[in-house]
Each structure stands twice: as C-alpha cells, then as structure tokens.
C-alpha cells in the first residue's frame, strides 16, 4: 500500500515549532522580522505575498510588506533592499519574483544581505550549499521542504540510495541535488537533454520531479517502492468537472504512479505547503543567528 506523504500535516508541525521558538526569542527581546517586497500588480504574486505575510503574522513575526508600482526603477528597488539590509528589526528579506523587465533580478538578489536572504538565492548561500556547508546556508525553501518529506520516509542518512532529480533550475533542481548529496545519496540530475529519461528514472529509490510539465512522469518510469516527490504544479483542463473547469496536477501522472511507488506526494497538498513553512523556518533561523542563539533544528 502506497504511503501518501501529507505535506500539509508536516508543514503544520514545522509552523507550530516556529511559533514556539518565536515565543522564546521574543521573551529574550528578539522579534523575528520578515520584509516582503513586491513590484507590480501580477495577481499570482499578490496572492503569494499575501499568504506569506499572513503566515508570518500567525507565527508571531514582525511582518512588513513593501508594494511598489510596475514602473519602479532598478535603482529604486536596490535602495529599498539596502535600507532593509541596514534595518536591525528585519531578519529576512524576500523580493517576490518575477520582477518587471526593466529590473535585473540577479542584481536584486545579490543586493540582499546573505544573512537575510531567506529565499536562499544569494550566491553565498548557493555556494555554501554547493560545498556541503548545509547548516551554514539559508537553503531555498522548496527543496528544503521536499528534503524534510524525504527524511520522513527514508531517514536523514540516505547512504546506498539512488536519487534522480528531474530538473536543473537554480531554485529547485540544483539545490535539491546538493541536499541529497549532503545526505549521502548517489545523485543524478536529469533534464530535457537527458537521453532516455524514463530509463534514468527507473533506477531511482528517490525520484524528485521539478520541471513544470504536467503528468510527464509515467507509472512505468518509477522503480517499485520508490519515494516520489512531485514539485511541479500545473493547471490543466478538467472536462470531467464540467465545461471550462480546470484542475491542479503535478509533473507525475499520479493515478499511475501511486500503484508503483512506495511513497508519493500529492498535488496539491504535498510539497506546496512545505515551501511557505520553510520560509518561516528560514526567517526564524536568520533571527536566531543574528541574536547569537542556537539555530532551531527541523
């Protein structure tokens, strides 16, 4: 019987711990502060930013949102980020992506102080993760959350296990591979140019799909008993629900995969809830480090 990995439940446990640890920090005179910056009126970004702000407040953080117009210049955004870098009440800075075309996203990401880079995208955090200094880095939230789900099934030491990550993005694929390597898995990164992708996947004890192609990974790509982590989220037509209706699916053909896998994350309700939980965990870690306290373990 396949184990359905409940990301909502795991995320709730993380958020409970973040809230408890935040109360302890506040009792010692430190309130974790998260600043979220959004440029423009993109509806999806507005929803994401609002949910992050709500969750930060629920955790007991000092939460600040900076909403800037679509025509904001790169220099104006740099100035805001530099001001937030200097603000001792702010421990985490998140600039919602994508940014308007007149702004160089890479420059903005690298303007954020590495110790406040709760998205884990700054080159210093990327470098620490890439060289195995996982405990010193702020790790990107989605792979960090996915890794906790894997640990819940397979344990923290993945020695002897084969892992395949489909996708090589800087946000998910590469950091995911580095986290698996740090846990002693034998890791393969596969992507659109990989020859015979199904064959590459069939040997994986742990399969992470992060490409954004709906239901690409079929049941016969999966090793029996494998742990399958589906990071993808796509909206596709759902005629069975009625004309014009849509549904959310992942990169994995779930109905096929659950017949083969040992454990699998659903979409929705798998990796998604973990992303925002790990953002809160990163903000707490940044505040703890800034105040000279031990980092909480998750």
From Swiss-Prot:
GO MF terms, alphabetically ordered: methenyltetrahydrofolate cyclohydrolase activity; methylenetetrahydrofolate dehydrogenase (NADP+) activity
GO BP term, pick one: L-histidine biosynthetic process
Keywords: Amino-acid biosynthesis, Histidine biosynthesis, Hydrolase, Methionine biosynthesis, Multifunctional enzyme, NADP, One-carbon metabolism, Oxidoreductase, Purine biosynthesis
This protein's GO CC annotations: cytosol
KW Hydrolase (keyword) present: yes
InterPro entries named among the record's database cross-references: Aminoacid_DH-like_N_sf, NAD(P)-bd_dom_sf, THF_DH/CycHdrlase, THF_DH/CycHdrlase_cat_dom, THF_DH/CycHdrlase_CS, THF_DH/CycHdrlase_NAD-bd_dom
Enzyme Commission number(s) from the entry: 1.5.1.5, 3.5.4.9
Subunit structure: Homodimer.
Family as reported in the entry's similarity comment: Belongs to the tetrahydrofolate dehydrogenase/cyclohydrolase family.
Record's protein name: Bifunctional protein FolD
Organism: Chelativorans sp. (strain BNC1)
Organism lineage: Bacteria, Pseudomonadati, Pseudomonadota, Alphaproteobacteria, Hyphomicrobiales
Gene: folD
